[in-house]
C-alpha cells in the first residue's frame, strides 16, 4: 500500500501479487520497484506485522503456497524476461537454497505453477502462444517428481484440474471451440468425453462447487452458464 511505497523510496511501485498462507499467518508479496517487471518476493508475518528475512529476486511475481504453510513455489525469470524455471522456497531459508523442481528447455515456452480446485495436486503449465503442456504432482508428496499429463502437440492447448478423484481436461484437440474430457487421477491414459464439442459453440471453463460443476458456453455471441 501507500506505506510500502513510501518506505521503498522508489518513484515506481508495482505490485505483482499478495498471497496468504493457508494458516493465515503469513503473506508472500512481490514488488517491482524499477519498472522492469522483475519482481522481488518478500515474506511478512501477519502476527507481528514484520517482514521475515526471506527475499527472492528476479521472479515473475506469482506465488503458490504449499499446504504445509512452510514453503511456496515461484517462477524465476531468465535474462530475456521469460519464466522458465519453477523453484520451491522454504520459509526462513536463503533463496540460494531453493529447490529447482522444473525447468523448461524450449526457449519459446514459459512456465507457471498453480494448485487444483480440490488442493490435491500442483499443476505446472508450460506454453507458447498456441501450445500447452502440463505436469502434476501431489500436494502431499514428500519428494517432488512432476508427472507429464499429456505430451505437447503443436497447436493443441489444454488445461487440467482435479475434483473428487478425477482430472478434468479443457482442450481444443480435435475440437476448435474446445471440449472437456476427464479421467480418474490414477488412470490418466483412459480419457473419456465429459462435455463434447458443439457446433458453433465455444465450450468455456468450469468451477467446482461441492456436488456441482458450474461451466460456461458461448453461442451466437451469447454467454451461457450451466450447472451440472
Map each language-model feature to its residues:
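Peripheral, non-catalytic segments that deliver or gate enzyme domains
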Residues: 1-228
Amino acid at each position: 500500500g501507500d506505506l510500502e511505497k513510501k518506505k521503498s523510496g522508489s518513484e515506481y511501485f508495482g505490485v505483482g501479487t499478495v498471497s496468504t498462507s493457508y494458516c493465515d499467518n503469513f503473506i508472500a508479496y512481490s514488488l517491482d520497484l524499477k519498472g522492469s517487471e522483475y519482481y522481488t518476493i518478500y515474506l511478512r508475518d501477519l502476527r507481528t506485522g514484520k517482514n521475515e528475512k526471506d527475499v527472492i529476486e528476479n521472479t515473475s511475481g506469482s506465488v503458490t503456497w504449499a499446504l504445509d504453510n512452510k514453503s511456496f513455489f515461484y517462477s524465476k525469470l531468465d535474462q530475456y524476461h521469460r519464466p522458465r524455471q519453477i523453484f520451491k522456497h522454504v520459509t526462513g531459508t536463503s533463496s540460494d537454497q531453493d529447490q529447482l523442481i522444473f525447468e523448461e528447455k524450449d526457449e519459446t515456452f514459459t512456465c507457471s505453477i498453480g494448485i487444483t480446485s480440490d488442493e490435491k495436486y500442483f499443476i505446472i503449465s508450460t506454453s507458447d502462444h498456441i501450445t500447452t503442456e502440463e505436469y502434476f504432482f501431489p500436494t502431499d508428496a514428500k519428494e517432488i517428481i512432476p508427472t507429464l499429463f499429456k505430451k505437447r502437440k503443436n497447436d493443441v492447448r489444454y488445461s487440467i484440474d482435479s475434483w473428487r478423484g478425477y482430472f478434468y481436461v479443457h482442450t481444443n484437440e480435435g475440437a476448435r471451440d474446445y471440449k472437456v474430457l476427464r479421467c480418474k487421477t490414477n488412470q490418466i491414459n483412459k480419457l473419456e468425453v465429459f462435455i463434447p464439442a458443439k457446433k458453433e459453440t465455444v465450450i468455456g471453463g468450469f468451477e467446482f462447487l461441492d456436488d456441482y460443476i458450474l461451466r460456461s458456453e458461448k453461442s451466437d455471441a451469447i454467454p451461457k452458464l450451466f450447472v451440472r
